[in-house]
């Protein structure tokens, strides 16, 4: 969806692909491989969001994980936030699960209260929402909460690890998509993804002193 200018410490900028190129990439893969799930993260432009929505409506059989990325963990902007928020409305009803952090959840809904904001997503057509609490002011732990069809299904608390991590949200959403592709329910997929992510974060490596930690995924 985009070429980014970044290193292990921050995002400096990006150039989004055209919607035509995005759809060409998607159709090339679909014509070659037995796709079962789609995960999106940074989309960059409203045109790309609309193109993805068009593609997903053509393929309702695919599981879809929406990670509504607006800002990188390092603080770098990944698009015009106000414009992208309005466009994400088109993708929300198409997703099997949405995985916002609390900053993204508040931006998507315009509400500060997390419970009210989560319910607002369901009013917008969401099926399931995993609220990630890494940006909240809880120095000792991180709390994630899973909601399905408007109901609070489960939550996890894990010790807050020291440092900043590069790609943790992307890794979590991708793992969920992989488990959904294998036939897991949303609840089971999230459980496996959270367990796996905590393990790879504990083994994360720092390429350069002062940089973000990179999850050891393999």
Model-based region annotation:
Residues 1-75, 218:
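Conserved N-terminal subdomain of the carbohydrate kinase-like
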Residues 152-154, 179-193:
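Phosphate-handling active-site elements
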Residues 152-166:
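Short pre-catalytic strand/loop immediately N-terminal to key active-site residues, enriched for Gly-Thr
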Residues 35-37, 65-73, 99-106, 131, ...:
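Short beta-strands and strand-loop turn motifs
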Residues 107, 163-186:
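Short, small-residue alpha-helix embedded
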Residues 187-218:
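Charged C-terminal helix
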Residues 81-153, 195:
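Conserved phosphate/ATP/ADP-binding segment of small-molecule kinases
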């Amino acid at each position: 969806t985009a070429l980014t200018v970044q290193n292990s410490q921050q995002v400096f900028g990006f150039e989004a692909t055209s919607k035509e190129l995005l759809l060409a990439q998607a159709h090339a893969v679909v014509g070659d491989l037995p796709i079962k799930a789609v995960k999106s993260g940074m989309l960059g432009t409203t045109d790309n969001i609309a193109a993805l929505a068009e593609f997903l409506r053509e393929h309702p059989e695919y599981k879809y994980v929406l990670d509504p990325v607006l800002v990188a963990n390092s603080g770098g902007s990944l698009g015009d936030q106000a414009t992208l928020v309005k466009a994400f409305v088109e993708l929300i009803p198409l997703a099997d699960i949405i995985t916002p952090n609390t900053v993204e959840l508040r931006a998507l809904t315009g509400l500060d209260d997390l419970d009210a904001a989560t319910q607002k997503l369901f009013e917008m057509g969401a099926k399931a929402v995993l609220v990630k609490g890494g940006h909240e002011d809880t120095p000792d732990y991180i709390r994630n909460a899973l909601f399905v069809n408007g109901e609070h299904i489960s939550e996890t608390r894990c010790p807050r690890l020291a440092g900043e991590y590069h790609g943790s949200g992307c890794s979590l959403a991708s793992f969920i998509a992989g488990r959904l592709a294998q036939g897991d329910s949303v609840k089971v997929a999230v459980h496996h993804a959270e367990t796996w992510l905590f393990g790879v974060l504990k083994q994360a490596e720092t390429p350069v002193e002062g940089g973000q930690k990179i999850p050891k995924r393999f």
